Design a protein with these regions (language model features):
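Short acidic/His/Gly/Ser-rich catalytic and metal-binding motifs that mark active-site loops
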Residues: 35-39, 124-126
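Short amphipathic alpha-helical segments
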Residues: 85-87, 130-134, 154
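A short beta-sheet element
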Residues: 28-30, 37-108
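Short coil/turn segments at secondary-structure boundaries
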Residues: 11-18, 117
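Non-catalytic DNA-recognition/assembly elements of restriction-modification systems
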Residues: 1-10, 35, 133
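Short beta-strand/loop turn elements enriched in aromatics
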Residues: 18-35
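Specificity-determining recognition surfaces
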Residues: 104-136
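Amphipathic alpha-helical segments
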Residues: 101, 135-167
Length: 167
């Protein structure tokens, strides 16, 4: 139902890191927000010459962490490139509401499937085959939109309350 592709890294990566204005956003796990689901900025950029060795992502793409803290989904709010610690999940058939899919991929039910499929590895890693073998419940697109909007509103309220706690 979706296209799943692994990120990649030009090597050695230090040769490709740049501060140049034409640099491409280099999405790292540390760029993912602690609260929220949208990646809107990166700390580092890579040179355009590294593009052939990585995976380009665009606003509206969904990415999923696939190693160490695996199974955390995020929605891209910017153009960028992902390394091999991420999987790109692109809805090429318009079967999913993006917010719904992002929330669904981060549920305990999905994490349990990821753990089951990754069992036996020294380090739990996901790959596109493992993620592609997961089972998802798929309500109508209209129902997905309602659920996705509802869950995003709850996330927004939680973030606002947490900010107030730390003021």
């Amino acid at each position: 139902l979706v296209l799943i592709e692994r990120g990649g890294s030009p090597r050695p990566i230090d040769d490709y890191i740049t501060d140049a204005p034409n640099g491409l956003n280099w999405v790292k796990i540390g760029d993912a927000p602690e609260q929220g689901r949208y990646i809107t900025k990166t700390v580092e950029k890579i040179k355009p010459e590294g593009l052939s060795k990585t995976r380009q992502v665009q606003p509206g793409d969904l990415i999923l962490s696939n190693s160490m803290s695996f199974g955390k989904p995020y929605i891209m709010g910017i153009n960028g490139c992902i390394h091999d610690g991420w999987l790109l999940i692109r809805d090429t058939q318009s079967r999913f509401d993006l917010k719904f899919l992002c929330h669904m991929l981060g549920t305990e039910q999905m994490l349990n499937q990821y753990r089951m499929f990754a069992a036996g590895s020294t380090v739990n890693n996901l790959n596109k085959e493992l993620v592609g073998n997961t089972t998802v419940s798929l309500p109508s697109i209209e129902e997905q939109r309602v659920i996705g909007d509802y869950l995003e509103n709850i996330d927004h309220l939680i973030t606002l309350h947490q900010r107030k706690l730390f003021e």
